[in-house]
Structure formats: structure tokens, C-alpha cells
Amino acid sequence: MTNRTAYFYDPDVGNFHYGAGHPMKPHRLSLTHSLVLHYGLYKKMMVFKPYKASQHDMCRFHSEDYIDFLQKVSPNNMQGFTKSLNTFNVGGDCPVFPGLFEFCSRYTGASLQGATQLNHKICDIAINWAGGLHHAKKFEASGFCYVNDIVISILELLKYHPRVLYIDIDIHHGDGVQEAFYLTDRVMTVSFHKYGNYFFPGTGDMYEVGAESGRYYCLNVPLRDGIDDQSYRQLFQPVIKQVVDFYQPTCIVLQCGADSLGCDRLGCFNLSIRGHGECVEFVKGFKIPLLVLGGGGYTVRNVARCWTFETSLLVEESISDELPYSEYFEYFAPDFTLHPDVSTRIENQNSRQYLEQIRQTVFENLKMLNHAPSVQIRDVPSDLLSYERPDEADPEERGSEENFSRPEAANEFYDGDHDHDKESDVEI
């Protein structure tokens, strides 16, 4: 197959609900996927229904007690887990909701399968917009995140890759990933985020640089309110180029939190969808194996626009600014475009002097790095997941005709003659 981009999507992942009034909306994943379909971008990718991560997979990073708790707790029995809820920081921002463990299993499994396919050179780019939940810690939930799919995926990548670079463009600091790899030079973490004024999670000062073997392999770029495309570009591109030149990663993981866009419900930056996408395109340009993940993003319609646009950049396909008609078309009113104006009146508090100070400090830290730390040759551990699924029929075994026929629902998406959603069927 000539196409080297793998796209992972579970049709049920958008049906989970954190609860009334909660800003995290998994439904944004359904909107994103719908646009990917209706723009025809799926034709440019290998599309996979992903593996579901097991408890064992999650315990590669998280504690067994914590994962066991996530599997057992539910809205119906949570009164019996009062002590555990406090211990594991579940409740409030990280609520117990129906299907919590199942949700974690689905988004984590997709990221893990993406890492495995990169390891086996099945693809050059793997995309999982459901992943990127970067705040989860070893022993607890944090910031709407329960299982840290990023850390688990990087651990899988490290079986084959001596050096993995992690880049985070979410408005919130990637604290869970930084903490996991703070003491090692095998993973370099680079986070661009809002810092100061008690903004969550309160970490990510530029003087947090790593420790022990990981000293100077942790890079933080703390930003102030209102940063725009031009200011962000002037920092992002030279910093990432320098990091790649110094560190020489053999694989990159890119967390594309869309809460750094202007007009985000929880954000205070002023990036446009094109400006956010420029970062993705710049990282892709290094032609290094790349795992692309979602993350934050709380104005649902703009998250879907952003990740759809970035999918188009990753597969190098130009798409129209006019959105295609889909079942979620009304979400994108009143303009129905891919690139609406998302700028706000928030003043850009990142002065030229401030940006220059950050750049100089970051480059000073980079000079302290050992170029491309090496790893001793060793046996490669077995893959964390197997591609043989016991619940799926053997494709080599011919079954009866009835196994291959099914009713075709009128509201389902089909490519070709089976598509019921003809232009004549809809009134706009």
C-alpha cells in the first residue's frame, strides 16, 4: 500500500459523556470523524477500528490499585468507594461516568496500536484524535484525564526507538508526560503552554529541565495570554528545529490539544486553525515516524475543524474552506466554514522582549544536552498487543453468505452505491 498514514477511530468513543455541564465532550470526536469522512480524507489513509487496551496494558505505567479501581467504580456503586475516590483524585473535574473504564480502554488502545504500527513500519504517521490525555499520573486522575495513553504509547515506542521526542501544543502544560520521563534521556519532552496566574496545572516553568540522566531533556516554553500565530511561530519553529538537530529523535509523538485556539471555552490564546496546523505541518516536515494525538479542546465545533484540517495536512490533501454537508452540519453555523475567525479581544501579552528571553533561555538549556544519547543493544521485548483478536472471525476461513450480509441503515455512511445520503435526500 502506498499510503503510509494510519488513522484510528472507534465509532463508540464519541458516545461517552462526562456529565452535564462538564467541558470535556467526547462527542467532538464524532464531529471530527464525520468531517474526515465527508471531505473524503479517509481515502488517503489506512483506517483501523482500534484495539482496546487491557488492564495489563494500562499497568505498564499506572499502579494496579488505581487501574483496578477505574475498572470497578461506576455511578451506581461510587458511594462505596469514598476513600478510593479521594486517593485517586476521581470526582469533580474527573467524574465517575457510565463506561469510564471502557472509554479509557478505547482511547488508550488506539494510541498503543498506533505506536505498535510505527514500530513495525506499517505506517509513517499514526493518528488518534481520541488520545493525548496528558495530565493523568501514575497513581491518579488529573485534568479530565484518567489513563495516560501518551506515556503508555511512548513506552511501547522505546522498545524499538532509542530516542523519542514528545511535543505538546495544548494550552495546558503536559505535566503527566513530563513527570513520567523526568529522569531519563530516552525521552525528551517539549511543552508550549500558558503559565502563570494559577493556570492549570501550575507547572511548566522554563527552569524545570529534568533531573539525573534526564537533566536538560525536559524543555518548557511558558507563554502568556493572547499569543497569536506570528509570535507562536517565531518560537515554535526555531525551538523544535534546534531540538531535532540536537536530540536526533528516531520517533516523534505530537499532542495537538486544540484548546490553544482562540475562542476556546477554557483557553486564553489566540491561535487560528491555520496557525495551529502550521505546527503539525512543520513537525511532519522532518520526515521522522510520527504519532499524532488529540488532547484538550473545549469549543467542540472548532476542535473538529482543527483536527480535520490537520488530518488534511498530514495526508497532503487540500480541502475546501466550505464545509461538506453532514449530519452535524448545524454545529458549524452561522458560517459553515473550516476556517472561521476565532480571534478574540485578548491582548497579546507576549512582548518581543519576553519571547526573546524565553528563546535565549531555551537555547542555553539545549547547549547543555549530550548530542543524541545512545542505547545499548538488547533483545526487543514482545509487543504489548497482539494483532490476533479472539473475537474476530478468521479471514482465511470461508463462512456462509449470511455472515457477510447485513442490513444497511439509512443513516450510516457508505462510500459508493450503498450511500443513502444522496443530495436529493436532503433539504438545506
From Swiss-Prot:
Superkingdom of origin organism: Eukaryota
Region named Histone deacetylase: 3-316
Residues given in the record as 1D-myo-inositol 1,4,5,6-tetrakisphosphate binding sites: H17, G21, K25, R265
Active site: H135
Catalytic reaction list: N(6)-acetyl-L-lysyl-[histone] + H2O = L-lysyl-[histone] + acetate; N(6)-acetyl-L-lysyl-[protein] + H2O = L-lysyl-[protein] + acetate; N(6)-(2E)-butenoyl-L-lysyl-[protein] + H2O = (2E)-2-butenoate + L-lysyl-[protein]; N(6)-(2-hydroxyisobutanoyl)-L-lysyl-[protein] + H2O = 2-hydroxy-2-methylpropanoate + L-lysyl-[protein]
Region (Disordered): 381-428
Basic and acidic residues bias: start-end ranges: 386-405, 415-428
Record-level GO BP terms: angiogenesis; circadian regulation of gene expression; dorsal/ventral pattern formation; epigenetic regulation of gene expression; liver development; negative regulation of transcription by RNA polymerase II; posterior lateral line development; regulation of circadian rhythm
InterPro entries (UniProt xref): HDAC_PDAC (IPR050284), His_deacetylse (IPR000286), His_deacetylse_1 (IPR003084), His_deacetylse_dom (IPR023801), His_deacetylse_dom_sf (IPR037138), Ureohydrolase_dom_sf (IPR023696)
Subcellular location: Nucleus; Chromosome; Cytoplasm, Cytosol
Main location: nucleus
Coiled-coil zones: none
EC class of the enzyme, as a word: hydrolase
GO molecular function per UniProt: chromatin binding; histone deacetylase activity; histone deacetylase activity, hydrolytic mechanism; histone decrotonylase activity; metal ion binding; protein de-2-hydroxyisobutyrylase activity; protein decrotonylase activity; protein lysine deacetylase activity
Activity modulation notes: Inositol tetraphosphate (1D-myo-inositol 1,4,5,6-tetrakisphosphate) promotes the histone deacetylase activity by acting as an intermolecular glue between hdac3 and N-Cor repressor complex components.
GO cellular component: chromosome; cytoplasm; cytosol; nucleus; transcription repressor complex
Keywords annotated in UniProt: Biological rhythms, Chromatin regulator, Chromosome, Cytoplasm, Hydrolase, Metal-binding, Nucleus, Repressor, Transcription, Transcription regulation, Zinc
SS bond partners: none
EC number from the UniProt entry: 3.5.1.98, 3.5.1.-
Family under the similarity heading: Belongs to the histone deacetylase family. HD type 1 subfamily.
Name of this protein: Histone deacetylase 3
Annotated source species: Danio rerio
